[in-house]
């Protein structure tokens, strides 16, 4: 069809040119004017040639673009950019390379948070959206690329503390994806992106539902996870291409929202995810390992990752291994935590890392360095996370944690349950003087019993913690209610699970309230099969 239109226009332009020149020869005698007319006519035909008229923008995810995407998703950004540069030269009207460059911006800004890089790249958002608008609306990529771009910039803006505009970016992404789902229901990548956003929207607290509904954002954890699973279980070219990205979303949501943590690590093992060469999977496995009390596993993953040139240089590797080593009270933990603080240019994590560094020195009886790390907490800018608020609060208090409880906490966080229990063995709440220490003791004991699968003993200690601390500002009582909810949920006692999830939500004005409320709300949604 395209070749037919080109031939028709070629004949038309040939006729115009011949007729125009024939008529002009009748009236123009000057050889100079004649040459000028010939030149203008020739230029006219070149400028309005069929090739120019039909040089419209396209979305062509060809083999070369697929190769670039695969390199980028492994965090081999330089290799991906080189392939993109070649594609741009060979196919200047293909919009997919510009779309893929947004992934490069995203990974650089999301993981490293360098303000100078942000300043350099922030205008790319508007430029790329305008470029995508030049593509054919008949392609499912017309809306899909814009949705991905807005989604990635929403995450970036959260990292840079611009939560208001991040919310608007998420809304734009959500609505584009929703519209694309309606226009192209068989376009499989919709399930990956829209499914992920459905889950995220499904965790919005009830108090904000009116606002999300007003903005057109309505989600469902159940529906969103079903969409993601449908995508991963399908058998088509798009699943093959977007497989790794979809897995990243799926496992994080399964871990944090569905609370199916064991299934996450079973998936990583059974699917044989390349946690060595794919640095996105390296980060996923190590980060979730640390947050699932598997510090030994995280250290193993990080120590075996491919360190060859070409990967994105990320200070967060030092943070992750520093956390994992601290959770086993290893003497070299401070090396990694200090290196992170020195090299990381962003705000996220910094106060939390400095708090952990202060704990390390405090447990080493190096009070001078412990105090210096605390002082830095108060000097650093805040990204506004709950962990940072807690670190700031502790630093301002001037009070240091009880060393027995701190060691037990770190060892339990690392998955070294027997060692943690041994620290507290033979002690009771009466051995601690301060009310907050008595409260923390019962909570720590409950968590250790819980993690050792001694559920009845855990529930007993959790209930004591709730009774002692439900009106205090520490997070121990609210977290205890959440954990009791988890225990009953696993027993399939959904009615009691909902009672304790709601009890967690009902507790006011305590540390980590937003994140604990979100987890409790997700628990209620699961129990209601929502």
Residue spans of the language-model regions?
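Residue-level detector of the short coil/turn that links helix A to helix B
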Residues: 75, 161, 258-259, 293, ...
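Residue-level recognition of tetratricopeptide repeat
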Residues: 69, 103, 110, 148, ...
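Short coil/linker segments at helix-helix boundaries
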Residues: 57-63, 71, 75-83, 101-270
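Alpha-helical adaptor scaffolds
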Residues: 247-256, 290-291, 405-415, 431-474
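Solenoid-like repeat scaffolds
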Residues: 56-58, 86-92, 136, 183, ...
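Alpha-helical segment of the N-proximal tetratricopeptide repeat
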Residues: 63-77, 284, 402-419
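Generic helix N-cap/helix-start motif at coil->alpha-helix transitions
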Residues: 58-64, 139-140, 187-188, 206, ...
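Alpha-helical repeat scaffolds
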Residues: 82-85, 117-133, 164-178, 216-232, ...
């Amino acid at each position: 069809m395209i070749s037919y239109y080109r031939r028709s226009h070629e004949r038309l332009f040939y006729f115009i040119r011949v007729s125009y020149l024939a008529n002009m020869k009748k009236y123009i005698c000057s050889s100079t004017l004649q040459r000028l007319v010939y030149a203008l006519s020739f230029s006219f035909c070149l400028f309005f040639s069929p090739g120019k008229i039909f040089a419209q923008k396209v979305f062509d995810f060809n083999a070369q673009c697929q190769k670039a995407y695969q390199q980028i998703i492994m965090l081999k950004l330089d290799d991906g950019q080189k392939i993109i540069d070649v594609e741009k030269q060979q196919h200047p009207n293909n919009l997919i390379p510009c779309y893929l460059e947004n992934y490069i911006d995203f990974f650089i800004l999301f993981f490293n948070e360098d303000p100078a890089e942000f300043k350099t790249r922030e205008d790319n958002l508007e430029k790329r959206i305008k470029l995508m608008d030049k593509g054919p609306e008949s392609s499912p990529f017309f809306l899909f690329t814009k949705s991905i771009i807005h989604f990635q910039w929403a995450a970036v803006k959260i990292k840079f503390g611009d939560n208001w505009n991040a919310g608007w970016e998420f809304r734009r992404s959500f609505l584009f994806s929703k519209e694309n789902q309606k226009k192209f229901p068989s376009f499989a990548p919709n399930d990956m992106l829209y499914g992920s956003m459905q889950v995220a929207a499904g965790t919005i607290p009830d108090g904000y539902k009116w606002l999300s509904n007003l903005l057109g954002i309505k989600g469902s954890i159940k529906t969103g996870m079903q969409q993601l699973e449908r995508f991963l279980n399908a058998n088509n070219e798009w699943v093959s291409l977007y497989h790794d990205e979809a897995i990243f979303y799926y496992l994080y949501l399964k871990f944090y929202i569905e609370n199916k943590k064991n299934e996450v690590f079973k998936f990583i093992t059974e699917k044989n995810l390349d946690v060595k060469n794919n640095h996105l999977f390296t980060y996923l496995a190590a980060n979730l390992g640390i947050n699932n009390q598997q510090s030994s596993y995280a250290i193993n993953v990080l120590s075996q990752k491919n360190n060859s040139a070409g990967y994105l240089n990320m200070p967060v590797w030092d943070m992750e291994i520093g956390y994992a080593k601290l959770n086993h009270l290893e003497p070299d933990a401070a090396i990694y935590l200090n290196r992170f603080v020195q090299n990381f240019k962003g705000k996220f994590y910094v106060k939390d890392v400095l708090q952990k560094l202060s704990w390390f020195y405090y447990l080493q009886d190096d009070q001078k360095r412990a105090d210096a790390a605390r002082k830095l907490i108060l000097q650093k800018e805040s990204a506004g996370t709950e962990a940072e608020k807690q670190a700031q609060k502790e630093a301002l208090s001037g009070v240091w944690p009880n060393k027995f409880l701190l060691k037990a906490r770190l060892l339990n966080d690392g998955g070294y349950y027997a060692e943690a229990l041994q620290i507290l063995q033979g002690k009771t709440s009466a051995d601690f003087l301060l009310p907050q220490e008595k409260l923390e003791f019962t909570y720590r004991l409950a968590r250790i019993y819980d993690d050792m699968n001694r559920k009845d003993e855990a529930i007993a200690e959790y209930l004591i913690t709730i009774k002692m601390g439900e009106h205090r500002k520490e997070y121990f009582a609210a977290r205890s209610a959440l954990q009791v909810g988890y225990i009953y949920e696993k027993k399939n006692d959904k009615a009691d699970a909902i009672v304790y999830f709601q009890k967690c939500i009902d507790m006011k004005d305590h540390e980590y309230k937003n994140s604990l409320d979100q987890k409790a709300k997700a628990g209620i949604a699961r129990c209601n099969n929502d």
